[in-house]
């Protein structure tokens, strides 16, 4: 279901789940920001942006899990991107963000950029989160199924990018395929994942 409003407490729970994710010995996205709190604050800004833009969905009214995605040809306009951009600048430094951008470029072409260049349609997932009180109860599968169902309906793949091997392994377990790995040096690694659509009986040819 589409999320139309959230309390600041609910937004913070998503930010905290990201900012304080246990990366073990991996680097994770916090390397691009000024620590765990700054990462959590940036994610809160991201959530506010996708909420304003109408891109945020949840598993139920209880909000166990959330997913933000955009359909083919959808654009994230200024009202979506402005809070996200402000969140980046408030929780990092311009120097660090520039270094992060250079590291991404050196890491190679992303799956999203490759598909854009090839003019292939896809659903792009920008955020997946299960609130900490609901983790380990199967909600990650349920939240991903929201985007997967859209991919099946439209006949297009679902793609996303994640910042930890442990997260990547979970996505693979839940039906996605690893489509590429990018070494960002001191900023860690990024993993491209894809899930191809399953054809419905109506779409199958005899």
Over which residues does each language-model region extend?
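Conserved active-site alpha-helix within GNAT-family acetyltransferase domains
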Residues: 141, 153-155, 164-181, 185
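Conserved beta-hairpin
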Residues: 52-70
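Conserved acyl-donor/pantetheine-binding loop and adjacent beta-alpha core of acyl/acetyltransferases
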Residues: 66-128
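Active-site rim helix/loop that mediates acceptor-substrate recognition in acyltransferases
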Residues: 33-56
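Conserved beta-strand-loop-alpha-helix junction that forms the acyl-donor binding cleft
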Residues: 126-135, 159-169, 186, 196
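Conserved acetyl-CoA-binding loop-helix of GNAT-fold acetyltransferases
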Residues: 130, 136-149
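Conserved GNAT acetyl-CoA-binding A-motif
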Residues: 122-123, 150-163
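A short beta-loop-alpha structural element at the N-terminal edge
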Residues: 1-16
């Amino acid at each position: 279901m589409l999320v139309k409003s959230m309390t600041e407490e609910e937004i913070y729970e998503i930010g905290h789940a990201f900012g304080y994710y246990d990366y073990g010995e991996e680097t994770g996205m916090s390397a691009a920001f000024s620590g765990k709190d700054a990462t959590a604050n940036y994610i809160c800004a991201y959530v506010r942006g996708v909420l304003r833009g109408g891109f945020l969905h949840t598993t139920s009214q209880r909000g166990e899990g959330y997913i933000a995605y955009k359909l083919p040809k959808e654009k994230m306009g200024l009202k979506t991107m402005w809070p996200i951009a402000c969140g980046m600048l408030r929780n990092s430094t311009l120097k660090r963000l520039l270094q992060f951008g250079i590291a991404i470029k050196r890491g190679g072409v992303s799956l999203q950029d490759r598909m854009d260049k090839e003019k292939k349609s896809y659903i792009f997932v920008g955020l997946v989160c299960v609130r900490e009180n609901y983790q380990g109860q199967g909600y990650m599968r349920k939240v991903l199924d929201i985007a997967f169902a859209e991919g099946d309906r439209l006949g297009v793949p679902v793609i996303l990018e994640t910042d930890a091997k442990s997260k990547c392994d979970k996505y693979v377990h839940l039906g996605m395929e690893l489509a590429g790995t990018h070494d960002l040096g001191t900023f860690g690694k990024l993993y491209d994942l894809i899930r191809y659509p399953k054809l419905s009986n109506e779409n199958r040819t005899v």
